[in-house]
Amino acid sequence: MSNYSHVFQEFRPIVEQSNEDRLYFLEEDRWIGYPAANDLLDQLKGFLTLPKRSRMPNLLVLSKPNNGKTSIINQFFKLYGEGYVNAENNAVKPVIIVQAPVSPDEKALYMAILDKFWVPFRERDPVAKLRYQVVHCLKLYEVKLLIIDEMNSLLCGSPIKQRTVMNAIK
């Protein structure tokens, strides 16, 4: 039996597993940090420590498809975004990640955000009520960072709808 010295130590036990288990292992998500990704993680982490102000900074990350943007977001959430209960027994969700709606629709964006809080809502509720619920949840759960993935979906549709959604994000 070989000691598999050519295999990274952490992965040596995998070599002894069945073919099915090794293939499953190969298909699992794995984080491989690289300088640009680590820089982005550091920048996002910095946002978590900023004091509140009327217009908080924002960040738009652009790159070609399948370049790892969502993987970076998921890694950031894994490191810093998990919810917890604070000293006052209040639930805290420091980071909320939502998928942008497939079209620039303010109501759909609010529903996507509310869904992440597991808050009940009715699809037929007026936009103003959904907006109120979103703002309430963001404050209640002390959200420091709202990440909207696949923002390019919001660039479809008429310029008026795009502006409406962009104003909602502000």
Language model segments and positions:
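Residue-level preference for the first positions of well-ordered beta-strands
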Residues: 56-60, 95, 145
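A glycine-rich, hydrophobic loop/mini-helix early in the fold
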Residues: 76-77, 87, 99-106
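Post-Walker A helix-loop "phosphate-sensing" segment adjacent to the P-loop in P-loop NTPases
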Residues: 79-89, 119-120
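Short glycine-rich substrate-engagement loop in P-loop NTPases that contacts/grips substrate
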Residues: 101-136, 155-160
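Short basic/glycine-enriched coil/helix segment immediately N-terminal to the Walker B
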Residues: 135-144
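Conserved Walker B catalytic segment
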Residues: 147-170
